[in-house]
Amino acid sequence: LYTDGSSRGNPGPGGYGVILEDIKSGVIRECSEGYKLTTNNRMELMAVIAGLEKLNISPVDVEIITDSRYVCDAVEKKWLFKWESKGFKNKKNKDLWKRFLIHFNKHKIITTWVKVHNNHRQNERCDFLALSASKKTNKKTDHEYEKNIQTKMGFKD
């Protein structure tokens, strides 16, 4: 599972790109999505979640290959599980981390970090998909992110 997320501005319009590659069958699928206002870390994490949600079988061994230290370190350094044990108190993107954990607990997942813009073919393709999605005119709304912005500005429901 190759992933990348980006935002043009942080926050700003963003997108993610995903390549799913089934090693056994050789089948390759791509997906991407754009959002009106979001952050780079939300898009990095959303890319992983979108890829995991596309898996048709469960449980399965999954290698997530990403240029996101945010995602890799949270898993490999076990920060995510510490955050979970504390109820994600004061953690950014807790809505997405909770969604990620649902899939993490279903599958056997490892993460592999790749250096950004280092001629890694699949990472470059995911970057292209993410950037292209961020430029589409029919982008989605990242409701949770926008709700959090309004709450911080004092516009609570």
What does each of the following model-derived ranges do?
Residues 44, 48:
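Short, conserved alpha-helix that lines the donor NDP-sugar binding/gating region
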